[in-house]
Structure formats: C-alpha cells, structure tokens
Amino acid sequence: MKIRRFFILGLLLVSCGEAQEDFDLLKGALQPNAPRFHPRANTLATLRPIPPRLEVGFPSRDLAGVMLLETERDGVQSWLTADGAAITLDHGMLTSAKGFGSGMSSSDVRQSAALILEGQEGQAKRFHSFLNGNDEIELHAYVCQIANLGAETVLLSGNPVATTKLQENCFGIEDTFTNTYWVQNSAQRVVQSLQWTGNFLGNMFIKLVPDDT
C-alpha cells in the first residue's frame, strides 16, 4: 500500500498537532530513529513573516510536503524539513540532499546551470559526491545532454507562469538519470523541477511557493 503523507512544516505555524502527526509518518518511512522535531525546524516555525517555502516530493515513494528556507547567500539556499533533512539549491539547481537516505553530499553542476538558466541546449559535465555505507565519499562523474522541450505554463499558487521546459539526460559509469526543469522566461530562474538525489529515492519534485504578500 502506498504512503501518501505530508511533512508540511508550514502547517506547524497553524496547527502543530496535525503537522506533528504528518511529520512523524514521513519520518517513520525515511528516518525511523530521528527525533520528533529538529531544533532548527522549531526555530524556523516561530519566525514571522513565514520563511519562503518549497513544495517537494518523491514521486517514486508517493511522498510530498513542504520545506522552509533556512539560509540564503549569493543564490545558494538551504532548505529544511521538520526532522532536519535538508537540501541545497544553487540558483535552483540541486547540489546536496542530506537526511533522505543515500543522497548527495555535494555536487558541481555549474556547466549544467549555465545552459539551463539560459534555456540553451548542449552538453555538460557534472560531478556528485555520495557518502557510502563505510562513511567514505564516492565521487561520480556524468556527461549530460540538455534538450529544450519548448514553452510550457506552470501554475504557482494558481497563477500561470510562462516557462521553458528543459530536460537533462545524464550518463555515468554506475548510474544514469534524467532531470527536468521549468525555467521562468521573465526571470531566468527555475520555478519547478524534478532533480535526482541518488538511487535510494530517485528524483525529487521541487516547486517554488510564491510569497503571500
């Protein structure tokens, strides 16, 4: 039976009990021994105004929810779940995913980003670091082919946003994967994407949630 539960940190601001239950169900699937709430997540939940949010999910496991922005500097953002799992985005490109099983420790995606943010096709190399079961870092290299799939409208909080859809097919010695990006035409930013985190959970769905203001 598939699990369809939400780890919605934003709901913690409104209904703590409900959010706790949902957080626990997701955490049980991914991190059975994790604490009920991570102290950093509790701190974020008390901030006003509410920090920026992402809709996220793992289609392969039918899991979905929301992450809150913890830090941002020079286009590099750190996002956090209730139980302390975190991702890093560099101008919308996923560079790390920690706390989700065997996810990426870090990555170099500069060549891919240079093409994708400009809506251009071409070939790029990227490098991912993974922590294996022996607590050793493994470096994986990939050659990626980026294709422009044309114009597509994305709804952000019900509002249509004109984007260019791009697909990135990456090939390495040990694994292959496909990332998909929707880049806002007017701002050259990734507003929605499916990006690979590793073999355990596969692709992560990531979507911006516009500010309420």
Region roles according to the model:
Residues M1-K2, N42:
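Poly-acidic low-complexity segments
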Residues K2-L9:
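Sec-dependent signal peptide recognition
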Residues L12-S15:
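C-terminal motif of bacterial Sec signal peptides marking the signal peptidase cleavage site
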Residues G17-T88, G92-K98, E121-T213:
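Acidic, serine/threonine-rich low-complexity disordered tracts
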Residues G103-N132:
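N-terminal trafficking/processing presequences and adjacent post-cleavage segments
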